[in-house]
Structure formats: C-alpha cells, structure tokens
Amino acid sequence: MKPLFKIVFVVLLLTLAAGYLYREPLKQMIFTQITEGMFVAEDNDDFDPGPAINSHFPGLQATYQGRSVTLIDEFKGANGTIVVASRSLDWCPYCMRQIIQLQENKARFDAAGIGIVVITYDDPILQHAFIDTFGITIPVVSDINALSFKTLGILNEDYRPGEFQYGIPHPGMIVVDPQGRVVGKLFLEAYSSRVGAVAALTFAKAALGLN
C-alpha cells in the first residue's frame, strides 16, 4: 500500500471511529439545528383533527409499564390533563425536542394542577431509551396497533400498514378536564412546528377555566 493511501485509510478509520464514539452528541447537535425555530406561540392555523370540543375523551388503547391502559385517570392532575400525541421518540427530532421542553417546564404544569401524558406509536423499548437518556418523568404510553390514534381521529392516513411510519398521529395536544371532557386542542398542520410548552400551559389553563 502506498504511503498516501495508507494515510487516507488511517484518516478514514479514525473518522469512522470518532463518528461511532461521538454518534449521540453528533446526533443531538444535528437535531438541535433541525429543530431551531420549531416552537410557536399559538395554534395559528385551522387544522383541527381530534375529538370535538365538549365531547367526552374516548380513552386510549395503549400500554404503560407493561400493562394495558384505557383511561387517563392515573395521569390527570387536580385540574385536568394534557394528552400529547407525538409521532416518535426514536426518530422524530421535533417530537423529542417538544417532550424535552415539556419536561423542562413540568414543574409549572404540576403547580397548575395539570397532568401530562405522552403517547407515541413507538415500541416501549424505544421509548425507554429516550426516557432514560433525557431523564423524562412525564408518563409516556405506547399506542397499540394505532387504535388510540384511530379512536381519537388523529391517525396520519398518509401511511399504510407495513410502512415504517404507519401508526403515527398528527402531533398535537388535547386538553381534558377532570370530568373527562375535551375542552381544548392544539394541532398544527406542519409536523415540524409545535406550540411551545409555556404557551401550551397558558392555553390549557384558559381552557380549564384556571385564569
């Protein structure tokens, strides 16, 4: 092997090794760049999937900590619940950033008596990888065969069974009062945009009559 080729070969190996060793920091750096400017202050479009306002929240068909979950009662706060429908905590950078931001502001929701529960289509093993990495204490449940998202009327129908992304929802938030009544929703047509955590809390408090 010629000296130049040896040098190129060694540099390539070192680059690959560095990429492997620092793959998670690199991934997070890329995700940070991708998600810059994703948060907005309000629901600024007319995209409005999901259960009707003033209807009864229909429940879930999901798993949480190895058991079946159909009700959101165990996740609710004294004044209500925000159900966060998210695409994936395994591959969707916007979803990951949103949940990290919600976690950063969880104390504010707790102080307002508003519980949060997140639901994605991910396998629980993939969810826990994210939860453990970022110290997420917000409950995260796993939809079963897209049944929750179908029932809620938020399943993204651009994908078909067998496709990688089949089962993802239109991402958004549903505000439910202590009696199980839907009192507010935040859905944006662009999956790359989300209402920020503080703005979502302000919206939820108003919808629940807490202001």
Predicted features and spans:
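Positively charged n-region of N-terminal signal peptides that target proteins for export
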Residues: M1-L4
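Hydrophobic membrane-insertion alpha-helices, especially the h-region
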Residues: K6-Y22
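Residue-level recognition of short loop/turn positions
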Residues: Q65-G66, N145, Q179
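Thiol-/selenol-based redox modules, centered on thioredoxin-like
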Residues: F164-N211
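Structural microenvironment flanking redox-active thiols in thiol-disulfide oxidoreductases
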Residues: M96-S148
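Structural micro-motif
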Residues: G135-P139, I154-P161, Y166-I174
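N-terminal "domain-start" segment that seeds a small globular fold
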Residues: I30-D73
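Short active-site neighborhood of thiol/selenol oxidoreductases, capturing the structured segment around
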Residues: L71-L102
